[in-house]
């Protein structure tokens, strides 16, 4: 027991006895309550600190966003620059430029411009007030010209082409070998051929050969159809030809394949219309790029046509097309090879003899034989069969050859009921 003195006038006895165990319990409970309150306050403090850090991070983020938006706003408020062309570079660092509005000026240039990028004909950006050269603009090419580059190689190789072994060997010698083994030509002391013309009837595999070259070589392959160079406005076709060869030089070693070159390479005549004159301007630019004053570097040209008789003689001379490869109609052995290539994935019956089919398809091109194989498969599907037999091929030959003979007869003036 413990004696506890009580204050006077408290209404209690001056002295009293309180059990020690009850007071200890009171103190322990009080300490426990204070500890729990302390833990809660610490937890609240920790949460407030985390919220403070989060708010500070957001503040930094918002300040960064404000600076970004302010910079973008200032950039958008910047007055536009004038596009001009350099005519001449003077010795004192000044330049003679021609603005897009027409007049010519002698102006200063920024000291941060690389002198190697400054040359007559370069596009530059000019200040609106002083017309000082601020920067040199990159050379812009026509998007249609940039789209001519073949990025994904075709899935055609020389094994997919039948009956053209001699043409394939010539193509390897003139196109592939100079790109893969140029040291051979240096040892012999000759310049490799830079131009190859493939000519022959339609459907004989000229474009297939070009696809195989694109698949085999690691050079940049640029494909264009001749009619794409025929433009509406004067000078547009010549500009596309110039940009086409510039692209080929930048990405050399490269191969330019011009399909249906007869659309722009026809003989030049005296009596012509305004449209013919524009085609002739494009042809002249093509002739200059193929074998003109400026060397074209490690750029090979491959062209195809089925009308070599109408091509301009200047286009066919050595130096432009050094080698002309004829792609003839396939022989019986070649037709059999072509049929085997197209039918190698087909489910054929035992009675199918591709040799006999090759013999009865005289004067058929590779495209005709491909159509015959496809039609034979269609006849089998029509009869609900998964095996192609000889009757399907006979029907396909009759259909394809009959349509071809009918079209040829109509062209010659024969009428059918």
Swiss-Prot record:
Subcellular location, principal: cytoplasm
Coiled-coil ranges from the UniProt annotation: 24-78
Annotated positions binding ATP: 203-208, 342
Region annotated Docks into pockets in the proteasome alpha-ring to cause gate opening, chain positions: 415-417
GO cellular component: cytoplasm; proteasome-activating nucleotidase complex
Domain of life: Archaea
Gene Ontology molecular function: ATP binding; ATP hydrolysis activity
InterPro entries found in the cross-reference section: 26S_Proteasome_ATPase, AAA+_ATPase, AAA_lid_3, ATPase_AAA_core, ATPase_AAA_CS, NA-bd_OB-fold, Nucleotidase_PAN, P-loop_NTPase
Subcellular location: Cytoplasm
UniProt keyword annotation of Cytoplasm present: yes
GO biological process terms, semicolon-separated: proteasomal protein catabolic process; protein unfolding
Keywords carried by this UniProt record: ATP-binding, Chaperone, Coiled coil, Cytoplasm, Nucleotide-binding, Proteasome
Domain statement: Consists of three main regions, an N-terminal coiled-coil domain that may assist in substrate recognition, an interdomain involved in PAN hexamerization, and a C-terminal ATPase domain of the AAA type.
Protein task: ATPase which is responsible for recognizing, binding, unfolding and translocation of substrate proteins into the archaeal 20S proteasome core particle. Is essential for opening the gate of the 20S proteasome via an interaction with its C-terminus, thereby allowing substrate entry and access to the site of proteolysis. Thus, the C-termini of the proteasomal ATPase function like a 'key in a lock' to induce gate opening and therefore regulate proteolysis.
Quaternary context: Homohexamer. The hexameric complex has a two-ring architecture resembling a top hat that caps the 20S proteasome core at one or both ends. Upon ATP-binding, the C-terminus of PAN interacts with the alpha-rings of the proteasome core by binding to the intersubunit pockets.
Family membership noted in the UniProt record: Belongs to the AAA ATPase family.
Protein name listed in UniProt: Proteasome-activating nucleotidase
Organism of provenance: Methanocella arvoryzae (strain DSM 22066 / NBRC 105507 / MRE50)
